[in-house]
A protein has these predicted regions:
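Short, acidic loop-to-helix structural element flanking the phosphoryl-transfer center
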Residues: 61-64, 84-114
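Active-site neighborhood of HAD-like aspartate-dependent phosphohydrolases
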Residues: 1-44
Length: 251
């Protein structure tokens, strides 16, 4: 029996892809056609993206869908495919922090590894195959096969045949999707801290009706169960968390 289920993020955690560059190019195309600045186009796209993400819809991370939505709002037409453009540069994707070796170590430690990403499979498949990451994971969870994003409880339902009573751990670099929501759903969390800047996706938990508590004018944001500086430190962090978990369970 596995010791625990680990939901491991992809982008920014175990790998970095050129997708941001492709999205930026898409916005430049729309800016050129509309006469707006790239920053203005980004603002329109972000509003659409955030609204979809607030409803946990997979289209929030369908960059071709968002491109078409923005083009429609701006009253322009453009022939641009994010998926096609990304496929030409995807081989530039790189593994971070010797992540294949870390994943191999986690697998040997008896954990069931699930690659858990908000990216759609039509974009992520190339990254996964380029870096050979599929060999380390028993399952791959994406919004298009889960029906929602990582801010919905159903995303984390264990696979068929995996004991739902096993401890579950989220490992990732995005505070909102890899720490805040997983903790809300009862998972342990390991935050791979890549930046000290505030996560812009906190806008999702600060929306009216989102239920975020406040005290003395400050948001009551839960801390990760463990924070690490890079993915390479996550194996030790996960081991310690689970030792503490089982110690509390026995007592």
């Amino acid at each position: 029996m596995p010791r625990a289920v680990l939901y491991v993020d992809l982008d920014g955690t175990v790998a970095r892809s050129p997708m941001p560059r492709v999205i930026r190019r898409a916005y430049e195309v729309l800016a050129s056609l509309s006469g707006l600045s790239v920053q203005q186009v980004e603002g329109v796209a972000w509003a659409i993206h955030l609204e979809l993400a607030s409803r946990s819809l997979p289209q929030a991370f369908d960059w071709d869908y968002i491109f078409e939505r923005v083009a429609s709002e701006l009253g322009v037409r453009a022939e641009f495919s994010v998926e096609r453009e990304f496929s030409t540069v995807c081989p530039e994707s790189v593994a971070l922090d010797n992540s294949p070796e870390v994943l191999r170590e986690l697998g040997r430690s008896g954990y069931t590894l699930i690659l858990a990403t908000n990216g759609l499979m039509k974009y992520q498949r190339c990254v996964i195959e380029t870096l050979g990451l599929d060999r380390y994971f028993s399952y791959i969870y994406t919004p298009d096969n889960r029906g929602c994003l990582k801010n919905c409880r159903e995303f984390y339902a264990p696979p068929e045949g995996v004991d739902s009573g096993l401890p579950a751990v989220s490992v990732g670099d995005n505070y909102t999707f890899d720490v805040y929501f997983p903790k809300l759903f009862g998972l342990l969390t390991v935050h791979v801290v890549r930046s000290t800047r505030e996560d812009p996706y906190l806008a999702l938990v600060r929306r009216p009706g989102a239920g975020l508590g406040r005290l003395g004018g400050l948001d009551l944001l839960p801390e990760a169960d463990a924070s690490v500086r890079n993915f390479g430190e996550s194996a030790v962090a996960v081991g310690r968390l689970l030792e503490d978990f089982h110690r509390r369970f026995r007592s």
